[in-house]
């Protein structure tokens, strides 16, 4: 079998201890990587794994705190206030929902797997498949949402005379983001399972991840290349082209006619937003490129890692760096781009000071609404 953690596969041959080989219905091997397979050699006791465990623990704790709290604040403020609702923020909300679910559901299980139990899954096959699936769906939702945001910004800035998306089109786009992500992530749940990784002092270390049969190696590699193209290379190239064209429009093209203060303010707002989005794209590439690169080398050039004792530890660190990208997205979208905290504080004040509600202006009272996204400029949030 080729074992896969997250959405990647381990292709080398692994020979489990003879006392346990008969209980396994598949051929599965880490032997080429010289992983510890007996009580005399435990990779979880090495200094390398100890350092990796600290890095992984800090990353997962950061994801749970930043993405859990930050995305909750954003979703709550977006639900409460009409002024925060436009197409861009609705797309960001989908990214926030997926990251929030990972932070509160997947990360606690992964903290237990990587840090507490040190590479041993104790929660059963169903949860193993569910956690793998949810994490993979979240990645694809994030990627597709970022791509949709880039295209939306491109159309709004480079082709301002073209009509913007209406409510029905926006709803269809959001549904498409989720449906594509849900469908192409199905193999991460279907092939997810548990198996004995190695034995330490008569205790089994249970691996949780995707395991593809040996006779389906070609299918796995084809699937991975499809994902690599559709969910990484394609979106990155498209977003880069969109932001390059937008940058030319905002920074290098002269604006005809007299520029009023309102026009200059709108231009500053658009530049600020595009800079944030470009930083998010850069962070996405820096976080996920090592993960995909590591996976390509491991699955297509396995001899590179032959006899590399700390291979698996290195992969887990690379995987955690990739997952940490969600923290960068949350910080940028919640604290930089949107003034979300200002609206969240206002919401808290309205909740804890009910006596002041009667003195609120009609503009404030109009904030609680289910209206369709508008295109006004408000604190650089509206982006026409």
UniProtKB/Swiss-Prot annotation:
Membrane topology annotation: Multi-pass membrane protein
Chief place of localization: membrane
Record: glycosylation sites: 7, 27
Tissues where the protein occurs: Expressed in the ileocecum, thyroid gland, pituitary gland, salivary gland, adrenal gland, testis, ovary and brain.
UniProt-reported outcome of changing residue 331 to M: In HH3; likely benign
Signal peptide stretch: none
Residue spans, topological domain Extracellular: 1-54, 111-136, 193-223, 295-313
Coiled coil: none
Cytoplasmic side stretches: 76-89, 158-171, 245-273, 335-384
Compartment(s) of residence: Cell membrane
Disulfide bond annotation, renumbered to this chain: 128-208
Domain of life assignment: Eukaryota
The keyword Transmembrane is assigned to this record: yes
Effect of residue 210 to R: In HH3; phenotype consistent with Kallmann syndrome; decreased signaling activity; abolished ligand binding
One GO CC annotation: plasma membrane
Example of a GO biological process term: circadian rhythm
Alphabetical keyword list: Cell membrane, Disease variant, Disulfide bond, G-protein coupled receptor, Glycoprotein, Hypogonadotropic hypogonadism, Kallmann syndrome, Membrane, Receptor, Transducer, Transmembrane, Transmembrane helix
A molecular function GO annotation: G protein-coupled receptor activity
Recorded consequence of changing residue 268 to C: In HH3; benign; signaling activity is impaired
Reported impact of residue 115 to M: In HH3; phenotype consistent with Kallmann syndrome
Job description of the protein: Receptor for prokineticin 2. Exclusively coupled to the G(q) subclass of heteromeric G proteins. Activation leads to mobilization of calcium, stimulation of phosphoinositide turnover and activation of p44/p42 mitogen-activated protein kinase.
Family according to the record: Belongs to the G-protein coupled receptor 1 family.
Disease note: Hypogonadotropic hypogonadism 3 with or without anosmia: A disorder characterized by absent or incomplete sexual maturation by the age of 18 years, in conjunction with low levels of circulating gonadotropins and testosterone and no other abnormalities of the hypothalamic-pituitary axis. In some cases, it is associated with non-reproductive phenotypes, such as anosmia, cleft palate, and sensorineural hearing loss. Anosmia or hyposmia is related to the absence or hypoplasia of the olfactory bulbs and tracts.
Quaternary structure and partners: Homodimer.
Protein name per UniProt: Prokineticin receptor 2
Originating species: Homo sapiens
Gene: PROKR2
